[in-house]
């Protein structure tokens, strides 16, 4: 009987516990009031700010932004290497007919001809040969006179004239010397201005003048071996000679000087000293 009563009380306790758990799960307290009503009278405030978290991993690369404004012009770079030779340009217009050239060299002897009639021509052959030489010299002199008549410039001490035959620098030197002059040497501003005006009014762009550094690289001299001590009129940035081949000098129609390659051909100016009376 006692054992049955003990079992009954235990079962009642278990049922009471289950009942209380059921009430709690339904949101009711012991007084059968909804839990929500109890919580509604209390204000839930946020807690204090937590510590900074660890730095996260880098995000993905963003999209490209808009192109910015163009920056200022940079400093001029160093001179680059010489490029490959360009393509051959279009053929230029046909120039005006030039003067008749000088007599060329003798050709290869031809085949022996047939025997001719007997003639006592020995005394004439020497005369004919000398006549041919005289005619060749006369043609050369006439060409020189023609150039001089076309226009000269002069100062109190010198004559200047433009030779309108394209020659390289050494040929120009020889041409002037054979005729008793030299390539023009503008040793002061007055002479330089006179020659430049002469070139410009003749309709030319550039001519050889008597200045070079053929004897010693970088040390420019007049053709009479005097240095450029008192006067020179180099163009801006000249003499440049980036590859070591520009040893001769040209004058532009502006009067400025440029160093240039000696093998180029162009017109040139000779100067002659006036004979004292």
Curated annotation (Swiss-Prot):
The signal peptide, as residue positions, is: 1-27
Ranges where the record places region Disordered: 40-107
Cellular location of this protein?
Secreted; Golgi apparatus; Cytoplasm
Q: Does the keyword Transferase apply?
A: no
Enumerate the spans annotated as C-type lectin domain: 155-271
Which ranges are annotated Basic and acidic residues under compositional bias?
49-64
A GO term, aspect molecular function: chemoattractant activity
Per the record, its GO cellular-component terms are:
collagen trimer; cytoplasm; external side of plasma membrane; extracellular region; extracellular space; Golgi apparatus; serine-type endopeptidase complex
Q: List the disulfide bonds.
A: 176-270, 248-262
Tissue expr: Highly expressed in liver, placenta and adrenal gland. Moderately expressed in small intestine, lung, stomach and prostate. Weakly expressed in trachea and spleen.
Q: Which UniProt keywords apply?
A: Calcium, Collagen, Cytoplasm, Disease variant, Disulfide bond, Glycoprotein, Golgi apparatus, Lectin, Mannose-binding, Secreted, Signal
Per the UniProt annotation, where are the glycans attached?
Answer: 258
* GO BP: any one term: positive regulation of opsonization
Entries under Pfam families matching the protein: Collagen, Lectin_C
What are the residue boundaries of the Collagen-like domain, all occurrences included? 53-112
SMART domains referenced in this protein's UniProt entry, alphabetically? CLECT
Q: Which PANTHER family would you find in this protein's record? A: C-TYPE LECTIN DOMAIN FAMILY 11 MEMBER A, TETRANECTIN-RELATED
Q: What family classification does the UniProt entry report for this protein?
A: Belongs to the COLEC10/COLEC11 family.
Annotated disorder: 3MC syndrome 3: A form of 3MC syndrome, an autosomal recessive disorder characterized by facial dysmorphism, craniosynostosis, learning disability, and genital, limb and vesicorenal anomalies. Facial features include hypertelorism, blepharophimosis, blepharoptosis and highly arched eyebrows, cleft lip and/or palate. The term 3MC syndrome includes Carnevale, Mingarelli, Malpuech, and Michels syndromes.
As for what it does, the entry says:
Lectin that binds to various sugars: galactose > mannose = fucose > N-acetylglucosamine > N-acetylgalactosamine. Acts as a chemoattractant, probably involved in the regulation of cell migration.
Q: What is this protein called?
A: Collectin-10
State the encoding gene.
COLEC10
């Amino acid at each position: 009987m006692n054992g049955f009563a003990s079992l009954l009380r235990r079962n009642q306790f278990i049922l009471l516990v289950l009942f209380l758990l059921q009430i709690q799960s339904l949101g009711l307290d012991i007084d059968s009031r909804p839990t929500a009503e109890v919580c509604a009278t209390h204000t839930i405030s946020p807690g204090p700010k937590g510590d900074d978290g660890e730095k996260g991993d880098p995000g993905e690369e963003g999209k490209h932004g808009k192109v910015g404004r163009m920056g200022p012009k940079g400093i001029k770079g160093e001179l680059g290497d010489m490029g490959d030779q360009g393509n051959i340009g279009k053929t230029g217009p046909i120039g005006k007919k030039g003067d008749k050239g000088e007599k060329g060299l003798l050709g290869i002897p031809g085949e022996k001809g047939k025997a001719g009639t007997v003639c006592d021509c020995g005394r004439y052959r020497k005369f004919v040969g000398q006549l041919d030489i005289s005619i060749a010299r006369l043609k050369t002199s006439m060409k020189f006179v023609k150039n001089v008549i076309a226009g000269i410039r002069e100062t109190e001490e010198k004559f200047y004239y433009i030779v309108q035959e394209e020659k390289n620098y050494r040929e120009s030197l020889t041409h002037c010397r054979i005729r008793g002059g030299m390539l023009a040497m503008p040793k002061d501003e007055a002479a330089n201005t006179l020659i430049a005006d002469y070139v410009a009014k003749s309709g030319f762009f550039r001519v050889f003048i008597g200045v070079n550094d053929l004897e010693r690289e970088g040390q420019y001299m007049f053709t009479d071996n005097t240095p450029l001590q008192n006067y020179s009129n180099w163009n801006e940035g000249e003499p440049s000679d980036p590859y070591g081949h520009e040893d001769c000098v040209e004058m532009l129609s502006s009067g400025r000087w440029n160093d240039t390659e000696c093998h180029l051909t162009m017109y040139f100016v000779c100067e002659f000293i006036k004979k004292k009376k």
